[in-house]
Amino acid sequence: MHMLSFIGALALPVFVCAQSCEPASLSPRLAGVDLEKFRLTPNAEYVDSDQQIPISTTNVGLIEQSYVETAIKLVRETFPTASFRLREDHYVGDNGVAHVHFRQTVHDLDVDNGDFNVNVGRDGSVFSYGNSFYTGPVPSITQLTKRDFTDPVAALKFALTHLQLPITAGDVSAESTEHPHKYILRGTSGAVTDPKARLVYLVKPEGTLCLVWRVETDVDDNWLLTYVDAKTAEDIHGVVDYISEATFQVYGWGINDPGQVDSRAVLTDPWNLKESPLTWFSDGQKNWTTTRGNNGIAQENINNLPTYLNNFRPDSPTQNFSYEYPAGGSPKDYINASITQLFYTANAYHDLLYTLGFNEKAGNFQWNNSGLGGKDKDYVILNAQDGASRNNADFATPPDGSPARMRMYLFTHTTPPRDGVFESGIVIHEYTHGLSMRLTGGPDNSRCLSAFESASMGEGWGDFMATAIRLKPSDTRATDYGMGMWVYNDEKGIRQYLYSTSMETNPLNYTSLNRMWEAHAGGTVWASMLYEVLWNLIDKHGKNDGPRPTFDERGVPRDGKYLAMKIVIDAMALQPCNPDFVQARNAILDADQALTGGQNKCEIWTGFAKRGLGQGAEYGRGRRVGSYDIPSGVCQKKI
């Protein structure tokens, strides 16, 4: 019997900021450097399932060879003269849709933001697709053959200086790898791992192709890919940050924070063997007696150390993780309870997401995938009471096969400070960054939520999932929710408005984005739209207040809450790399089409149209046109 002591709190975002704060940058920890101005500009298109797709791409049956061949054929027909490579992260989702990803190449170098994703339906035909391939003139190969570009060390040093990264680069050398233009940069200090550099092409905002060094640096607070001009090593064309801001005695699943209940619950063996067949305390090779297992490893990191394996974590030979959480106590006095709570919430969310389709093939976070697809050795490193910062939390999502990292901080808006792990919405928000980054663009590409609107949706998905999970049996569409209310000790929460279906309480709409430039603000708009869709689906299908969905024979959740969560997750895998709001809306409609045959078009369109993302809504850089129209015939009543 294994027991954990946890608090089930579920509701805060990364790099959160109270309403009185200045807007947070892409990553506010780089003092004096605003990374927002280095965001990549999206250039993707998305062809949804309602549009005409060439019939010649149809194959019968959904075996791997067929769906991959179908996808290759579509790319070749769409771009007959383009060079590209098939990525290895293709898979069939549990909704029956196969996802295949390609990377454009020029002179055998990747075009790092040249992506093509193809979604193949159950019948073997193309369901939808997205792409951001470069279509302009291909540069001469002369620059490569004559090696008319700087060395990677120069690119690293410029990135360190220009972005003020805390890495010392004295006598640095570039060590070759098996790839002819990929290097490990040895001899630095201050980074978690040795920086890396790879020669690639990048499509610039004006549509030209530029040869760049992609410099990767992990300094704990920021895990950056910096695109440095390869010819001069004196210009940065873009930056991507991977970081988005037993018996257990815990606050159980669905309890958002200590303010909702008087005491914690004692839970015995809270895992589901279908979702965690190794339980939460084994990786298939060793059975642990501490907060470590296949899905995550939790420990304190009060001293902000870059390592984690030797950090303190509670240990119980009987796996009885019941620890005191004294009201008004100092954080250090309840560190065992804190680590246990974090371990519980992260594992419980892993299991729920697994049920909803985020499994090994889709790139989930597990040390051992047991041969079920995806890449191993990428559980989540879970740091409780991390000393790197205060009043925040963050999540780093590298590509599939590398561990993710969640850092939970103390919040100093009360005396004594409050520990963010006890507001489970914060943990869920952070973990959702990993979900959305692994699914959008495929498990091997963590660069697909780096533009303003896509990064905003990354924040919005976190708020949405945290809010959906904490709905109570008595809630109705008139119930409003805030984010971060407990840690900030503020009933209004940390967002500009509460999440509400009332336009008086929350007036945000699509064109509100025209006045925004920061991802958390934009994320509130997206989550507000999803909250409308959520309640439309609950009103139609009812609400399951249990911790797990039930499914019909087609694999469709039987209630509106879990159905909304399911189609939102499925849509992440359908949409293109760096989608805008319109494309992501269309992907949600497509997800419902693939899962239910489009039975919920009216509810989905009505939710989005209410907040300006109706049929005629258009995206333009810096200027968006709203629409409150619903397509004709979508909401016709049946006689």
Curated annotation (Swiss-Prot):
Chief location category: secreted
Signal sequence, renumbered to the chain: 1-16
Subcellular location(s) per record: Secreted
Catalytic residue list: 430
A molecular function GO annotation: metalloendopeptidase activity
GO cellular component, one term: extracellular region
Domain of life: Eukaryota
Propeptide cleavage-removed residue intervals: 17-245
Main EC class the enzyme belongs to: hydrolase
The keyword Magnesium appears for this protein: no
Entry keyword set: Glycoprotein, Hydrolase, Metal-binding, Metalloprotease, Protease, Secreted, Signal, Zinc, Zymogen
Cofactor(s) required, per the database record: Zn(2+)
Gene Ontology biological process terms in this record: proteolysis
Glycosylation sites: 287, 320, 336, 368, 509
InterPro entries, per database record: FTP_domain, Fungal_virulence_M36, Peptidase_M36, Peptidase_M4/M1_CTD_sf
Role noted for this protein: Secreted metalloproteinase that allows assimilation of proteinaceous substrates.
Family per similarity comment: Belongs to the peptidase M36 family.
Protein name stated in the entry: Extracellular metalloproteinase mep
Organism from which the protein derives: Aspergillus flavus (strain ATCC 200026 / FGSC A1120 / IAM 13836 / NRRL 3357 / JCM 12722 / SRRC 167)
